[in-house]
């Protein structure tokens, strides 16, 4: 009995250490930088009390550079499943307080496991990224972990919704997986994603560039088109993910949940007769028409800052989730250029995959 008590005490201590990630000091630094911890993010994202964590006590296997003497349970990834509005989702979050959220061979297995479970159960998967990239102490083994993650991203594409949030300085491999998912969220002035950071750019091509210019939320929201949603805070971002999920089905064999609607489907709006000018050379805002047609005049726009000459997003009609694609006469006369075509076609493919 005494031995069992000792074993249980050891387990409880490891569980406590895992819950603290990199420790109290690192958590304080995370908060000082204006960021939440991985566990705080998951708690805010999911319905209260629904999170079930997997592989909480896993540690890395690296013995190089004294790493064998510095093992933290959880190894920088918090993963598991829970519910959003009563619907099952799978989630994993990089813990920046543990080795800068770097990817190891071991914690890559945690991510792959959750990806496989999401695919098997036909449920959306959400990635909360706050990672410096590969763990250099592990060399090629860490990079191999990325290959496994990317493979699962491609296998899940068009089968289950994949959503990524960039919540810190994500470089290298930490950017590639999000780019393979369906939707990316970023936070103004807090989120950055780039293949290599400003220091490497300066060393290689002798060009000075800030983190914001190279890979900030505005850059990817308006220029590269990599990110779909730019938010003002982490709290807003996490709530926006919950809202996006409300428009989506669980998988490609399902349909989006129909919402109760008090908006009369047969209502008429006289303003629709006057929004479009008689002169075809006079611009108007297509969003005015969209908002008058959809339920409760609410339109959840996707990629609002990129290729503004075309509008895409989700809304509801008679309580059913619909995808909307519309030319925007108020910007470049609503012409179809390369960026607008890419923006619209990708959205149409997504809606087609998920019965929207």
Segments (PLM) and residue ranges:
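Terminal-region recognition feature
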Residues: 1-163, 169-176, 180-200, 205-356
């Amino acid at each position: 009995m005494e031995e069992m008590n000792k074993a249980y005490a050891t387990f409880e201590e490891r569980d406590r250490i895992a819950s603290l990630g990199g420790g109290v000091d690192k958590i304080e630094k995370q908060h000082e930088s204006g960021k939440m911890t991985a566990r705080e993010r998951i708690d805010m994202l999911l319905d209260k009390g629904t999170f079930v964590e997997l592989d909480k006590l896993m540690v890395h296997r690296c013995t190089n550079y004294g790493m064998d003497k510095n093992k933290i349970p959880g190894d920088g990834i918090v993963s598991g499943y829970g519910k959003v509005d009563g619907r099952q989702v799978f989630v994993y979050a990089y813990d920046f307080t543990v080795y800068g959220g770097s990817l190891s061979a071991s914690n890559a297995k945690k991510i792959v496991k959750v990806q496989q479970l999401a695919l098997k159960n036909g449920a959306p998967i959400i990635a909360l990224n706050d990672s410096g990239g590969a763990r250099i102490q592990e060399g090629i083994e860490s990079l191999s972990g990325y290959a496994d993650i990317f493979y699962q991203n491609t296998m899940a594409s068009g089968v289950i919704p994949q959503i990524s949030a960039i919540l810190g300085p994500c470089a290298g491999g930490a950017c590639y997986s999000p780019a393979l998912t369906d939707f990316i969220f970023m936070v103004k002035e807090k989120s950055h994603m780039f293949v290599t950071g400003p220091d490497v750019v300066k060393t290689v091509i002798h060009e000075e560039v800030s983190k914001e210019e190279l890979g900030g939320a505005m850059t990817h929201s308006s220029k590269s088109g990599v990110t779909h949603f730019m938010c003002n805070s982490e709290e807003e971002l996490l709530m926006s993910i919950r809202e996006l999920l409300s428009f989506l089905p669980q998988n490609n064999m399902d349909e989006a949940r129909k919402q109760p609607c008090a908006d009369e489907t047969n209502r008429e709006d006289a303003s629709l007769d006057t929004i479009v000018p008689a002169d075809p050379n006079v611009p108007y805002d297509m969003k005015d028409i969209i908002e008058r047609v959809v339920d409760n005049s609410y339109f959840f726009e996707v990629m609002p800052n990129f290729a503004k000459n075309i509008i895409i997003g989700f809304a509801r009609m008679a309580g059913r989730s619909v995808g909307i694609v519309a030319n925007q006469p108020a910007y470049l006369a609503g012409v179809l250029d390369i960026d607008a075509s890419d923006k619209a076609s990708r959205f149409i493919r997504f809606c087609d995959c998920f019965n929207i």
